[in-house]
């Protein structure tokens, strides 16, 4: 982010720059690592596709026409996610500064690894372009960017996620929430609506 971008996000949003050092990513194999800011999402996607010999169907189009990325946000209740991320440390969530001393707890890493493994097992680890955990916002959470590519190495958003109609899509999402609830159960997180 630029300095101007950070200042605006802190003014308007729920970011705390003094906790940015707590953010991390999960890399292939479930490895916890600092976020590689040198590789933006577009570059990660291009590298992933090139390494697998898959062409981006939106390449060369003036406007994208195909769903080539699925973005997930994983999280839970604010209170429980803060417990996982910060334990019993005193964090100032209101001033959005002065939290440089806060340490990231191993529980948030283990939770993220469990969610990563769920996504990898369900959709293929090779299709995960990024999995980033934010602990610098009011409610810690994970962002996952996934390529909807099937076993034939074809982009297949509708086949994988949507089904034939809205009812199929709704049922798929309800089922997905049920599956995630089983993963989150051990972390004291209950299924949302």
Residues covered by each model-derived region:
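N-terminal nicking endonuclease/strand-transfer module with a His-rich metal-binding environment
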Residues: 1-193
């Amino acid at each position: 982010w630029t300095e101007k971008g950070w200042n605006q996000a802190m003014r308007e949003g729920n970011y705390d720059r003094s906790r940015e050092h707590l953010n991390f990513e999960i890399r292939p194999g479930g490895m916890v690592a600092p976020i590689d800011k040198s590789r933006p999402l577009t570059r990660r996607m291009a590298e992933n596709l090139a390494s697998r010999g898959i062409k981006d169907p939106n390449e060369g189009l003036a406007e994208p026409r195909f769903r080539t990325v699925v973005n997930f946000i994983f999280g839970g209740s604010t209170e429980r996610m803060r417990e996982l991320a910060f334990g019993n440390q005193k964090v100032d969530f209101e001033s959005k500064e002065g939290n440089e001393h806060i340490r990231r707890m191993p529980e948030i890493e283990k939770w993220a690894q469990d969610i990563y493994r769920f996504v990898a097992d369900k959709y293929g680890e090779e299709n995960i372009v990024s999995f980033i955990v934010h602990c610098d916002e009011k409610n810690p959470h994970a962002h996952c960017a996934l390529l909807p590519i099937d076993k034939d190495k074809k982009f297949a958003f509708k086949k994988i996620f949507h089904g034939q109609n809205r009812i199929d899509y709704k049922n798929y999402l309800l089922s997905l929430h049920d599956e995630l609830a089983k993963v989150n159960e051990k972390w004291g997180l209950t299924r949302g609506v």
